[in-house]
């Protein structure tokens, strides 16, 4: 019979498999569209008639275009070919209303060549804002000299409180697509996602759908945005075009809807931008692989979390465990969380880091045998006593830290002084957190040496939570994949590869010091005792 723990793990794995299969089925339903099988109720593509088309892009400050007044033509592509990819950069005049925190819209028309858009009954058009509102990025300065790379003219005129208010930012890219497949839709089962982009006309006895025009909003990244100052009169706009297949179009529509839903649920523009980066900066096939990798990452995260908590919850002794390594992991995890918070990193990275910091704080409480007593609103901390075996482990631990400090502290202090002299920061707090985190990332693996030293002196690794380590080892290699996909600070990205080395060293020690099955573990049990224990007969 399965134990309760095994049954729970099997249940989690089973739910995970069902989730992956269901997601694959949903994705198949998105990219595959059943064509019309008969002549009745079929909707034919207008592009199959090979019409001569023209692409026109206008700008205006009005969200609803009633007439051809007060609009500016910024791009006109005559003899527009749906199959031909292009990219053009134009200068757009910025009206006074837009410079005063107003909005500027782009109207994209696809119409018959030689006919004005508003005189063409078979034209299709879409509207897209060319501006968005965001709080300007804080200016970075040299903390010693006060110098900055760029001085914001408008910032000098505004009070400090006004710098935290959202201002208009320019979107320098406008990515356009037209569905180029001559696909015949079944009118009785039109996909809802594509239907809202379709415009139908009656030609004789046949219903046709006009060219499906699509604006790729996922290509608008926060890193490309430009602040619009009151002195700005012209700004560059790069208009790009490429054809798109029906399957990719439907997938892209769903992804845009998902990003929009995140913003409706309270995600900031920057958080949503991190999700955009996964789709825009990644090949579609690699993206599919990433989905499966992410699913396994989620599974291993849960299993590692479950086994790690279970291990530390039952642990009563610190024999063979480096207390200094536990303290360091707690300090480094908290510093990394504060650094990611200061860098305004995506919630996709920030939330797991925060949960990890809370768990490490709890581990410190267990490692120090700490008891918290409340005297009114003031807490008092009492530390437990160590046994003779634990004091021996602590002695090895202190010895390792003594040698390590000779190398580590000068490197960290030197790095902090160098960054203060040569790198610009938003504030002294930002410099302090960056100095700490650079020390953690650059030399953090050195703090794993005390645990490795304790393992060496005891000639044993049986006291380590190997099941949790195994799941974490899988995840650290998965993190290597995500390091190239999700936007994050470079130092955090490099730390993912550093963890690979740490786990390889642990695996080497596990091979070097095989577990003695007669040895009593930290729970007072040995493998041979459990094997010889008679089952209950009642």
From Swiss-Prot:
One of its GO terms (biological process) is apoptotic process. This is Lipid scramblase CLPTM1L. The chain crosses the membrane at residues 11-31, 285-305, 325-342, 347-364, 403-423, 429-449. Scramblase that mediates the translocation of glucosaminylphosphatidylinositol (alpha-D-GlcN-(1-6)-(1,2-diacyl-sn-glycero-3-phospho)-1D-myo-inositol, GlcN-PI) across the endoplasmic reticulum (ER) membrane, from the cytosolic leaflet to the luminal leaflet of the ER membrane, where it participates in the biosynthesis of glycosylphosphatidylinositol (GPI). GPI is a lipid glycoconjugate involved in post-translational modification of proteins. It comes from the Eukaryota. InterPro entries: CLPTM1. Residues 32-284, 343-346, 424-428 are extracellular. The keyword Membrane applies. Belongs to the CLPTM1 family. Glycans are attached at residues 91, 101. It comes from Pongo abelii (Sumatran orangutan). It holds the Pfam family CLPTM1. GO terms for cellular component: endoplasmic reticulum membrane. It is found in: Endoplasmic reticulum membrane. It is a multi-pass membrane protein. Residues 1-10, 306-324, 365-402, 450-538 are cytoplasmic. It catalyses: a 6-(alpha-D-glucosaminyl)-1-(1,2-diacyl-sn-glycero-3-phospho)-1D-myo-inositol(in) = a 6-(alpha-D-glucosaminyl)-1-(1,2-diacyl-sn-glycero-3-phospho)-1D-myo-inositol(out); 6-(alpha-D-glucosaminyl)-(1-octadecanoyl,2-(9Z)-octadecenoyl-sn-glycero-3-phospho)-1D-myo-inositol(in) = 6-(alpha-D-glucosaminyl)-(1-octadecanoyl,2-(9Z)-octadecenoyl-sn-glycero-3-phospho)-1D-myo-inositol(out); a 1,2-diacyl-sn-glycero-3-phospho-(1D-myo-inositol)(in) = a 1,2-diacyl-sn-glycero-3-phospho-(1D-myo-inositol)(out); a 1,2-diacyl-sn-glycero-3-phosphocholine(in) = a 1,2-diacyl-sn-glycero-3-phosphocholine(out). One of its GO terms (molecular function) is phospholipid scramblase activity.
């Amino acid at each position: 019979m399965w134990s309760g723990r095994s049954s729970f793990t099997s249940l989690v794995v089973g739910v995970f498999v069902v989730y992956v299969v269901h997601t694959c089925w949903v994705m198949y339903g998105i990219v595959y569209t059943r064509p019309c099988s008969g002549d009745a109720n079929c909707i034919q593509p207008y592009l199959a008639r090979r019409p001569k088309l023209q692409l026109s892009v206008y700008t205006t400050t009005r969200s609803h275009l009633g007439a051809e007044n007060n609009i500016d033509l910024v791009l006109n592509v005559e003899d527009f070919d749906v199959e031909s990819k292009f990219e053009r950069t134009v200068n757009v005049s910025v009206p006074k209303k837009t410079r005063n925190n107003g909005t500027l819209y782009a109207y994209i028309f696809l119409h018959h060549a030689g006919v004005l858009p508003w005189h063409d009954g078979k034209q299709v058009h879409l509207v897209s804002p060319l501006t968005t509102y965001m709080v300007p990025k804080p200016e970075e300065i040299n903390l010693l000299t006060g110098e900055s790379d760029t001085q914001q003219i408008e910032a000098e005129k505004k009070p400090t409180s006004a710098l935290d208010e959202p201002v208009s930012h320019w979107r320098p890219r406008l990515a356009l697509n037209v569905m180029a497949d001559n696909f015949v839709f079944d009118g009785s089962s039109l996909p809802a996602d594509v239907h809202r982009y379709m415009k139908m006309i009656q030609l004789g006895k046949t219903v046709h759908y006009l060219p499906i025009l699509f604006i790729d909003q996922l290509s608008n990244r926060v890193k490309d945005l430009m602040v619009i100052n009151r002195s700005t009169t012209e700004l560059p706009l790069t208009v790009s075009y490429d054809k798109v297949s029906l399957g990719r179009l439907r997938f892209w529509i769903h992804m845009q809807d998902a990003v929009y839903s995140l913003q409706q649920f309270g995600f900031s523009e920057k958080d949503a931008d991190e999700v955009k980066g996964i789709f825009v900066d990644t090949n579609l096939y690699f993206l599919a692989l990433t989905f499966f990798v992410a699913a396994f990452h989620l599974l291993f995260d849960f299993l590692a979390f479950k086994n790690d908590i279970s291990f530390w919850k039952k642990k009563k002794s610190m024999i063979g465990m480096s207390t200094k390594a536990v303290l360091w992991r707690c300090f480094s995890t908290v510093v990394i969380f504060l650094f990611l918070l200061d860098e305004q990193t995506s919630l996709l990275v920030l939330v797991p880091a925060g949960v990890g910091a809370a768990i490490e704080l709890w581990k410190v409480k267990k490692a120090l045998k700490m008891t918290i007593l409340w005297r009114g609103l003031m807490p008092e901390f009492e530390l437990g006593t160590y046994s003779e075996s634990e004091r021996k482990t602590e002695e090895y631990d202190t010895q390792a830290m003594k040698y390590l400090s000779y190398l580590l502290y000068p490197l960290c202090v030197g790095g902090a002084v160098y960054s203060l002299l040569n790198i610009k920061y938003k504030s002294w707090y930002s410099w302090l957190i960056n100095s700490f985190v650079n020390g953690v990332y650059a030399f953090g693996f050195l703090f794993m040496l005390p645990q490795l030293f304790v393992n060496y002196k005891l000639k044993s690794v049986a006291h380590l939570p190997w099941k949790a380590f195994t799941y974490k080892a899988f995840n650290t290699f998965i993190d290597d994949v995500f390091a190239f996909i999700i936007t994050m600070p470079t130092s955090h990205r490099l730390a993912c590869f550093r963890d690979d080395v740490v786990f390889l060293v642990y695996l080497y020690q596990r091979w070097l010091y095989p577990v003695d099955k007669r040895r009593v573990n930290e729970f007072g049990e040995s493998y041979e005792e459990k094997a010889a224990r008679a089952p209950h007969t009642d």
